[in-house]
Amino acid sequence: MICPAPPPPPCSTLVQSKPQLLAWLTCDGVHIDPGSGKHTILGIFSNIQARQFPVTHPFMIWFLTLSDVSPGKHALKISMGLEGTAPQQLLDRPFESQSPLHRINLINELRNLRFDQPGDYSILIEVDDEPILATSLTVT
């Protein structure tokens, strides 16, 4: 006797991967072309130099692109702290995904970010409380 195979699960349950981070940039600005929707990234940097501490960086953008995000509402959290200290949550924002195939560009503005001393500041990026990137920003 041959038993028929059970029906396959719906497509939405076949792929349950965690979101993938395709791009992470620290920059001075992002221009979105109103005609094409293309993003132009301005002034990419990877460290901050100061003459004295504490120092306050007046404005920066953390630009990121995500893919493989399941449809629905989600939360992006970004925390930062000096190596060896507890990170402070700087950002907690909602975003929405229409499909895991879509690429989602998120532009996150940070104003008056204070650095009390030089060092490597750890940055943790989470989507729905799942870490997707741990990196650092050097401040000298």
Residue positions per predicted region:
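Contiguous segments within soluble domain cores/interaction surfaces
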Residues: 6-140
